């Protein structure tokens, strides 16, 4: 029973799809370069014509707190998560004209809301989309993007940036705290969504 319950948690939390050709690649805001690097690789391999990184900074910090990994590669002065993610994309071969701009979001739900505003303003019909996000963040990010794009088929392409993934989360207290914290946020935030509808 215990092992089965753990497996159910892992299947719910850790989403990884085989990407298909899409209309856009979404990258929710963060200070890690890996998600934008993966988005750039997918772009270079012809999976989508546009990438939409999204983010100002975390609402809890009130400012962009800086690059969290590979600082030797990405050492610019970034005011927003979008500035940082754009630089990562361009350093990894994505032309500026393929990068859409959303630099106001301060949390995941806003990433989805403001991304929808951008794609609507650009008259983009998003039938299929790839979502590049942190491994632990995949379920919550997908929940919000799916809410704002209910008719879009999503493919999650996640990155393990903090050594917490489907195979390792249960091995450390940090991993357990991260996954259980995400589950708690999903439950709380989804309950608020249900009450609004």
PLM features: residue spans?
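A structural signal for short, hydrophobic/glycine-enriched beta-strand patches
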Residues: 1-175
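C-terminal capping/extension of enzyme domains
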Residues: 163-197
